[in-house]
Amino acid sequence: MKVDLSITAVKAREILDSRGNPTVEVEVVVNDEFVGRAAVPSGASTGIFEAVELRDGDKKRYMGKGVLKAVENVNEVIAPEIIGMNALNQVEIDKLMIELDGTENKSKLGANAILGVSLAVAKAAANALGLPLYQYIGGVNAKYLPVPMMNILNGGKHADNSVDLQEFMIMPVGAKSFSEALRMCAETFHHLRNVLKARGYNTTVGDEGGFAPNLKSNEEPLEVIVEAIEKAGYTPGKDIAIALDPATSELYNEEDGKYYFEREGKVRTKEEMVEFWVKLVEKYPIVSIEDGVAEEDWEGWKMLTEALGNKIQLVGDDLFVTNTKRLAKGIELGVANSILIKLNQIGTLTETLEAIEMANRAGYTAVVSHRSGETEDTTIADLVVAVNAGQIKTGAPSRTDRVAKYNQLLRIEEELGSVAVYPGMNAFFNLKKK
């Protein structure tokens, strides 16, 4: 007999994200008693194929970034349709919202409106059943804690400095548990601060908590990270590896198919881009590169995958935008070997789970990710465990909006106890073991 968890109330409001911009928060009430609350994140470097985040455009309020229209869409359009539905029917509810919107990219109601409701429904159902969210979504086999892909140095759109590439991250692949992994990252982060200070650099942080110093080149961040790993007492590559998100779509000129490294003063062809990455991978303990070429450069992606696809993880973010149509094309063409999962790129929990399942069936890894504009919401921590993804990207250990996710993962690991699994290098299950 199916439990009846009737949705009895839905309420959206405008709140602030970690950058001081408005975002949508939604509360869904089940059986007049159990509440699920979710807040929606927002990106800075967004893929052109992403679902649309609805903003008011009224320059007199929050410089046009208000979300009152999205809030109104939840309260006046979505709420009347889903009140009375069973919160356990997640797929049906998500499908109904997609149909209510009626556009390819959720531009009518806004992906921020739809996602807020989608996640709040799942949380309300989990609370009503007395289950943690990861177990409600993932079932009895949800037990894999993720390897953090921790952003500790910023350039590009996430910082005001001389580095063209956007994110330099560390991955504690040699840890034995998530709590140990987190400690290794935090220690390296603190040692990196000292390394940067010793070189005369400032140690202010960017949107995602990583340092954003005015470094001299695109390679210097790698040098200082290796030094910090060693100073923390770890072996680069064995204990802690490096991951990159250069966000090259921001450097790409579609007209001539070239990449403009403005801060470095260099222009590279797609062939030179592949060569650039191959050389860096040979020189540094890099285990993952995200968006190594631009989202529309399918030819460049093919070349990059042929050159490095067996050696390291090649993650498609702007390339796939958590979208099954884009991912299906990538799988067919044999490009990349991993997908970045951002809930707000697609706009519902159901479509997110479909993208993860499609990736896994094709032998692609999935990396669950935050956005640069975050809140205290910790849904992605539960999601990454629910789907046994094995990797999470959610910033540095230095801002509450990022640390909230790590702290939730510590709680989940503690709750799982002896059944918790920390995959380490096995998170890269599709790579040829060195």
Curated annotation (Swiss-Prot):
GO terms for biological process: glycolytic process. Gene3D superfamilies: Enolase-like C-terminal domain, Enolase-like, N-terminal domain. It comes from Caldicellulosiruptor bescii (strain ATCC BAA-1888 / DSM 6725 / KCTC 15123 / Z-1320). It is found in: Cytoplasm; Secreted; Cell surface. Its main location: cytoplasm. SUPFAM superfamilies: Enolase C-terminal domain-like, Enolase N-terminal domain-like. It catalyses: (2R)-2-phosphoglycerate = phosphoenolpyruvate + H2O. (2R)-2-phosphoglycerate binds at residues 166, 342, 371-372, 393. InterPro entries: Enolase, Enolase-like_C_sf, Enolase-like_N, Enolase_C, Enolase_CS, Enolase_N. Its EC number is 4.2.1.11. One of its GO terms (molecular function) is phosphopyruvate hydratase activity. The active site is at residues 208, 342. It is an enzyme of class 4 (lyase). GO terms for cellular component: cell surface; extracellular region; phosphopyruvate hydratase complex. It holds the Pfam family Enolase_C. This is Enolase. Mg(2+) binds at residues 245, 290, 317. Belongs to the enolase family. Binds a second Mg(2+) ion via substrate during catalysis. Disulfide bonds: none annotated. Keywords: Cytoplasm, Glycolysis, Lyase, Magnesium, Metal-binding, Secreted. The keyword Oxidoreductase does not apply. It comes from the Bacteria. Pathway: Carbohydrate degradation; glycolysis; pyruvate from D-glyceraldehyde 3-phosphate: step 4/5. PANTHER family: ENOLASE. Catalyzes the reversible conversion of 2-phosphoglycerate (2-PG) into phosphoenolpyruvate (PEP). It is essential for the degradation of carbohydrates via glycolysis. Its cofactor is Mg(2+).
